[in-house]
């Protein structure tokens, strides 16, 4: 085989859980350990950096996981990945598992710890953040959380959690330009054919859209009342306040002003009545609808 380039990495995966050992591989603990060590040693001769993943690590006996991790580090692994392959783990459990490895693997300080989470129970982002709190410094995931079955960790959500909650993650910086997050999200959606749900955190079209009149009024007064992130920091434009039947008079007046439409105060009650009727007929009242209502007065 030809040696890899200077910036290349070989990623090796060996399943370690009892379920995989019995039903998929038909091998004992010792056979699995020997397979992993031999593979890592061979890869280390070909590449400057080897990553080892213990597939289904979250359902592997902690003591065996610690044993195999120690062995592959001695064999030359530089990155150790602890996957939650079937999205089985809860955040507290994941934190404990990473902490266990850090305290029970003598040579763990020689490597970078990584996690790879699946979202079968909606825990991929939470588990990844718990792992970071436990000391992991590599997170594997995908744009928009796409992936096998229910998907993988949504990287944009992890990035913005780290960015927005520096009180929790004071030692972690990603170096990522957060104002570029929306663009790759749209690109991935277009290329994969997998639409981003409107309600998806961070990059969903409704992530910063406020339909309730109470919410709109609060956001117009101060965005921090209902927003914990600045949409422009993510790559969105300014906060969107779509008009719906729940929108209040203040929001309607603000939109009229933005559109350059002037309505006498005496006509506002009638306009608002017409606006409410239009809102009952459709989900959103668009700018053209509002202009038509003004013309009808």
Language model regions located:
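Predominant activation on well-ordered alpha-helical scaffold segments within soluble catalytic domains
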Residues: 37-41, 66-70, 95-102, 126-133, ...
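Active-site loop-helix segments enriched in His/Asp/Glu that coordinate
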Residues: 1-3, 27-29, 61-68, 141-169
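Flexible glycine/proline-rich, aromatic-decorated loop/lid segments
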Residues: 6, 123-138, 146-164, 207-231
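Beta-strand segments within the central parallel beta-sheet cores of soluble alpha/beta enzyme folds
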Residues: 82, 110-117, 141-144, 171-183
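Alpha/beta enzyme core
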Residues: 1-113, 129-136
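Generic beta-strand/beta-sheet core signal
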Residues: 13, 53-55, 83, 114-118, ...
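Acidic, glycine-rich active-site loops and adjacent beta-strand->loop/helix elements
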Residues: 16-18, 56-58, 86, 117-122, ...
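A mid-to-C-terminal "edge-of-domain" accessory segment
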Residues: 160-162, 167-297
């Amino acid at each position: 085989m030809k040696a890899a380039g200077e910036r290349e990495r070989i990623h090796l995966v060996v399943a370690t859980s009892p379920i995989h050992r019995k039903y998929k591989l038909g091998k004992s603990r010792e056979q699995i350990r020997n397979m992993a060590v031999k593979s890592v040693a061979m890869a280390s001769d070909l590449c400057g950096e080897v990553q080892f993943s213990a597939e289904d690590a979250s359902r592997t006996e902690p003591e065996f996981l610690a044993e195999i991790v120690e062995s592959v580090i001695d064999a030359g692994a530089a990155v150790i990945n602890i996957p939650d392959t079937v999205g089985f783990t809860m955040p507290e459990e994941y934190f404990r598992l990473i902490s266990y490895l850090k305290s029970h693997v003598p040579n763990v300080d020689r490597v970078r710890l990584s996690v790879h989470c699946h979202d079968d129970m909606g825990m991929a982002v939470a588990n990844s953040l718990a792992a970071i709190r436990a000391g992991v410094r590599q997170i594997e995931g995908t744009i928009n959380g796409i992936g096998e079955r229910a998907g993988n960790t949504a990287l944009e959500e992890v990035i913005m959690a780290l960015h927005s909650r520096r009180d929790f993650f004071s030692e972690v910086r990603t170096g990522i330009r957060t104002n570029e997050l929306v663009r790759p999200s749209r690109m991935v959606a277009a290329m994969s054919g997998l639409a981003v749900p409107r309600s998806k955190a961070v990059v969903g079209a409704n992530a910063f859209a406020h339909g309730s009149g109470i919410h709109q009024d609060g956001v117009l007064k101060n965005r921090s009342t209902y927003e914990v992130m600045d949409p422009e920091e993510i790559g969105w434009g300014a906060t969107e306040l779509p008009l719906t039947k729940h929108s209040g008079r203040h929001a309607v007046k603000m939109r009229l002003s933005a559109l350059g439409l002037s309505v006498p105060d005496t006509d506002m009650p009638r306009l608002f009545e017409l606006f409410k009727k239009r809102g009952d007929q459709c989900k959103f009242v668009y700018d053209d609808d509002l202009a038509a209502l003004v013309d009808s007065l």
